[in-house]
Amino acid sequence: MILLHFVYSLWALLLIPLINAEEFTPKVTKTIAQDSFEILSFDDSNTLIRKQDASVTISFDDGETWEKVEGIEDEITWIYIDPFNRHDRAVATSMYESRLYITNDQGKSWERITLPDSEKNISSRGCYIETHPLNKNYFLAKCNYCEKTEVDNEENSGDEEGAPVIFNITHCTDKVFASNDGGKSFSEIKSSLERNENSAISISDCGFAKTGKDSDLESSDTSIICLFQNMQLIMDEFSSPYTESKLVLTTDWGKSLKEFDQFKDKVVNGYRILKSHMVVITQGDRYNDMSSMDVWVSNDLSNFKMAYMPTQLRHSMQGEIYEDAMGRIILPMSRERSDQEEDKGIVSEILISDSQGLKFSPIPWTANEVFGYINLYQPTYLKGTMIASLYPLSRRRNRKGKAKGVKNKGVTKISVDNGLTWTVLKVVDPDNADSFDCDITDFENCSLQNMFYTREGSTPTAGILMTTGIVGDGSVFDWGDQRTFISRDGGLTWKLAFDFPCLYAVGDYGNVIVAIPYNADEDDDPQSEFYYSLDQGKTWTEYQLETTIYPNEVMNTTPDGSGAKFILNGFTLAHMDGTTNFIYAIDFSTAFNDKTCEENDFEDWNLAEGKCVNGVKYKIRRRKQDAQCLVKKVFEDLQLFETACDKCTEADYECAFEFVRDATGKCVPDYNLIVLSDVCDKTKKKTVPVKPLQLVKGDKCKKPMTVKSVDISCEGVPKKGTNDKEIVVTENKFDFKIQFYQYFDTVTDESLLMINSRGEAYISHDGGQTIRRFDSNGETIIEVVFNPYYNSSAYLFGSKGSIFSTHDRGYSFMTAKLPEARQLGMPLDFNAKAQDTFIYYGGKNCESILSPECHAVAYLTNDGGETFTEMLDNAIHCEFAGSLFKYPSNEDMVMCQVKEKSSQTRSLVSSTDFFQDDKNTVFENIIGYLSTGGYIIVAVPHENNELRAYVTIDGTEFAEAKFPYDEDVGKQEAFTILESEKGSIFLHLATNLVPGRDFGNLLKSNSNGTSFVTLEHAVNRNTFGYVDFEKIQGLEGIILTNIVSNSDKVAENKEDKQLKTKITFNEGSDWNFLKPPKRDSEGKKFSCSSKSLDECSLHLHGYTERKDIRDTYSSGSALGMMFGVGNVGPNLLPYKECSTFFTTDGGETWAEVKKTPHQWEYGDHGGILVLVPENSETDSISYSTDFGKTWKDYKFCADKVLVKDITTVPRDSALRFLLFGEAADIGGSSFRTYTIDFRNIFERQCDFDITGKESADYKYSPLSSKSNCLFGHQTEFLRKTDENCFIGNIPLSEFSRNIKNCSCTRQDFECDYNFYKANDGTCKLVKGLSPANAADVCKKEPDLIEYFESSGYRKIPLSTCEGGLKLDAPSSPHACPGKEKEFKEKYSVSAGPFAFIFISILLIIFFAAWFVYDRGIRRNGGFARFGEIRLGDDGLIENNNTDRVVNNIVKSGFYVFSNIGSLLQHTKTNIAHVISKIRGRFGNRTGPSYSSLIHDQFLDEADDLLAGHDEDANDLSSFMDQGSNFEIEEDDVPTLEEEHTSYTDQPTTTDVPDALPEGNEENIDRPDSTAPSNENQ
């Protein structure tokens, strides 16, 4: 019995505390408020403040009671706690101009601070105070001012001072004021940039160099860093603001400013001052705010070094840059998102520097994974711990467009050793294992995934963490499936806390936890509640709230996490006039009967499982989980105990700058980093020893490791002081080949998409520096299609019926399923005016592609592929015709080529409602059709196996294209559309189709594409329809072609093709061979020396031989520049025997730059030119920065590779190039890419006037040294003059000016239809043919009443010449049929008005004559005094001025007639005398008649008038009278059987100028590819 009593007593003694614990209820106090969403707490105090409406309220008892503060008279917009004086100082900003309120005693009293008065018509948008970490009296006030509008001034003219105003944000200015006396007085730190009238925004951003009490930066307490910027937002053609900036240092409160020299010629985008580093970010291109950026790092505010970046930084989140405990810089990067996407500005990549801050690298396991949102969380109280999450930017959609979850796998990982090793977040929770959809013991495929772990607001605990997320393999993440988890070991393992997501907060160092569901209905109870745990999350108790609220925040009232009191702030939308807040103060301080923990209630918890981190072992003393007490050390920070590790290990080291970690984690030399470092600058030897490891800065291990040096090769490494030193190369190696690549044509970044030999897709957003694999979920990519009208869009076709679409250059992909049809490999057809509308072609009834029932179906989508509808059966090619024409007959028109299953013919049909009800057959039988440059051209079969072409410019009216009748044009069996810009179509009509011996005629159309003339004969083509034809980009009218010079022999199969290159400068009217340079690249004369270009000229390999049709001669960006591989001689030699040539004046003069064939690429609008050997291994490239005058070699890799291709962005405006190469490795070959960055070789960016005016770096100049007229005008182009600066994102092609319009010459005209150019240069009618029926124009334009006959010439459409020759002068007008009456009315004159005018003139003449006779002759004696009157005689009657005028007229008339009479008499006498002598000497021989003399005289005068035009019109005898209709001589016109040539005979050359004349520098932009060849055959 005694024993039982003892047991009962012991049981009661043990159970009572547990009963008390279970019965414990926290004290909860509710406060109702309006519009209060943020509560702030002073550190180490019970005082809280919050903004309620426009006032400030305060609580001195941890939120149980609240009152309005005294001393603040204004309405308040914002309050914040001073981060350096969190115990007692807060600031409230006033709604009114230039006023703030500050407290230094935890809100008990407030002092009003007034900043200096603003200028007239300037309004403040608010001010912010920044304080100093060491001196409480040091303030920096930052204010933003904007110009007041006229409405502001009117409305507020009579208001009291300080009244709120409306401001105009179009012109805003930042101002910074400094105070060193606690705000009693302020002085402005004025910007050192002068604001001009174009500046829309002026920014001043200043900050103290000391950012914390533990700052390691070498600076004084009064050091202030300021960044001043002027930005112009509206820039006409420019898409980005122009920015100028200055970064300065002041130590005397702004009285003097010292600019940082390293950034004088750069655009500083922003800066960040950290504990031991200052980071400065500069913008690569001042004219493109999306250009790549450079990161500069300093630890003394004096010397800055450029950090190495593994990728291009384009959108930094400067406010998020921070420094971890090791001194490493954490650099988050955002990206530009598509306008269609909702979430923007999300961190897309995180780079982490080494401890020196100079070499950045991505989180290792995210470097080559799918691109996505990245989040990094580093709890400061858990040294070495990092939690990172990757959320992919690719989502899957089904056919109906409903989201089915994340397509690519996301992942969350943790590291406890500063990122050296990473593991997944393991779920160790056997009790809840069945509640998860995967096996939680399979950690790699079943772990906790958390997408957003915030760095801010974390409360220190002894390894106790909470988060929300889902458990799985990362392939599915549905926000509705999130649950709440808890960890007690610093995040290594987790267990389930709640089946729903919660807001949470911890107190008493993690011993008290409060959690509230986001949604009150989560637990099937509509009322709100919160849960709390007093045993570190082991058990939970529910506390019911009487009101349903939306929780806004839950927080511990002590920021250091030591207290046990909490604030829960929630709101309800029940009231129509706004939100109502319910603020709950929750007090756990009396838990466990108010018991305080004793020593035996604690245990040691070791960070990182007891391993060394930073050379130290860390531990924390924490309460045991089941202890029945609270720590109750309120306002004491969590204590971390350190024990230095005796021996240093590799974990305490990082790779030296010149080394990188390989796949095994070993630090190996990196050639590109060696080039950037200075290790080879200090030695003349071939190798230099370098230690691969360096101790991490700040590591505390005691005994360093012995690190052996590695010999680094310095052969080929550029030395300091050379430009080559500044070139940055990034190498990537692959175990596959890249078979396809294409850039997205935007200035936003340098994104490109690549497909390898395995059908895998890879994406790079930095020009190939970093390359990421696209996860297609196991599907092979079988085709890639880029949208030609929307440069950020592309579509990838998967082998299993998926289509992956991107509209943001490959950052994110949407996945949809194609219709249930067989993929036929046909390209998509896009709507030019609707991004999400396109047509897909699939095979129906195609169990086998050879099945007779298998046929194509056109499917239409209007939502980017989410849904498809069947549009037209048997359609094999469609066009959104209405979106292509300038003036379509119907904007919704669609044209389709249809091939019925039962027929071998194809038809062309159209519809205006996507073939729902409207279907119109345009042609019953066609070969094919294509669209180009606003035309649609249809090839229609004709009798005798011939073709006919029909053209439309509106989709309704079709006209037959009339080809010229010529002796060498047989059947029209094949033609190729070459180009269709500037109102004409260039077409190649094949005249010989024998494989390997193909050639034909080059034709050009009129403006509506219906009438063609021959420009050149025997132009080379290949069997695939490609033609040696290339229009020079960026310049008008310059075309290069290759002709088959022995076409007759080739057609007869007697000889192989012999090609010659010809050039035209007036769009094909005249052709010449290329003038060769005098000497080769070695200064030697060429072997052929004939002065005839027919025998010795330059020839280039053309379009038909290119491996990649995008490798054009020219670039629209590099104006006038062309590269080509060819030779000087009578004909073109084989490719391997040729050299590389270059021109800067559009092909007028050339120079040999390399003795062997090279590949070329243009950069920076021609400011940087790069050559690389073709078909031979190399380790070097050649580059030029002076427009090809001089060339330098640069070694870009350690071993030789065979370069397959060199490329850059389509606009050729970047300073980065991408090389694709293949190198021999042990056991085989490896494919490699090299990104070569030339940004740093230029001293600065050229200074450009955005209005296009000349500046110190840009001048207007003609393309060549000769000021020739081209297309009737002389043009000058804006060109860079300084080779030491780079151009950047400036569209120089937009800046040219016409000096004058020239007189028309022969070069401004071309032959009209049915006319040909004869050997003498004139246009003559083909014998047997008639000119085109001029009256046909009356049928096309019914309103015309007249027409004109052709002169045989027509003016080149591009020509703007004025005056001069008028070879196209119209004939006399003829009446249009049926318009004779209107014609007669236009040109006839009625008799009545004509008679009236004639009689009136006669009367005027008669009256004037009578008046002169009456006043001047009759009154002075009549004609009797004729012989007496002399000039100046007196005696004439002159009573007034009229008499004097009349007498002067009479005297002058008599004088003139008198002299004429004398001259006639004298001439008569002399003639008679001469005739007498002639007759005496020659007897009866007769002389020339009078009319013959007059005619001869006219001819002499005509010769004078035509002086200077002889070479312009080779035979002008027919055109002496330019005012009348020309007659076309037919004496020299050959018959159809005769032979004639289509080009002007080549003049002999006496002096061929050297290429590359001085001053011929130019740069502009081109597309990445030429127009594709389109052939109908």
UniProtKB/Swiss-Prot annotation:
It comes from the Eukaryota. It is a single-pass type I membrane protein. The chain crosses the membrane at residues 1392-1412. InterPro entries: Sialidase_sf, Sortilin_C, Sortilin_N, VPS10, VPS10-sortilin, WD40/YVTN_repeat-like_dom_sf. It is found in: Golgi apparatus, trans-Golgi network membrane; Prevacuolar compartment membrane. Residues 1-21 form the signal peptide. Residues 1531-1577 are annotated as: Disordered. SUPFAM superfamilies: Oligoxyloglucan reducing end-specific cellobiohydrolase (SSF110296), Sialidases (SSF50939). Residues 22-1391 are lumenal. GO terms for biological process: Golgi to endosome transport; Golgi to vacuole transport; protein targeting to vacuole. Glycans are attached at N121, N168, N445, N791, N1008, N1301. GO terms for cellular component: cytosol; Golgi apparatus; membrane. BNR repeats lie at residues 58-68, 101-111, 179-187, 414-423, 485-495, 531-541, 762-771, 859-869, 1141-1150, 1183-1192. The keyword Endoplasmic reticulum does not apply. The keyword Oxidoreductase does not apply. Keywords: Glycoprotein, Golgi apparatus, Membrane, Protein transport, Receptor, Repeat, Signal, Transmembrane, Transmembrane helix, Transport. Residues 1413-1577 are cytoplasmic. Functions as a sorting receptor in the Golgi compartment required for the intracellular sorting and delivery of soluble vacuolar proteins, like carboxypeptidase Y (CPY) and proteinase A. Executes multiple rounds of sorting by cycling between the late Golgi and a prevacuolar endosome-like compartment. Binds the Golgi-modified P2 form of CPY, and this interaction is dependent on the presence of an intact CPY vacuolar protein sorting signal. Belongs to the VPS10-related sortilin family. PANTHER family: SORTILIN RELATED, SORTILIN-RELATED RECEPTOR. This is Vacuolar protein sorting/targeting protein PEP1. It comes from Saccharomyces cerevisiae (strain AWRI1631). The lineage of its organism: Eukaryota, Fungi, Dikarya, Ascomycota, Saccharomycotina.
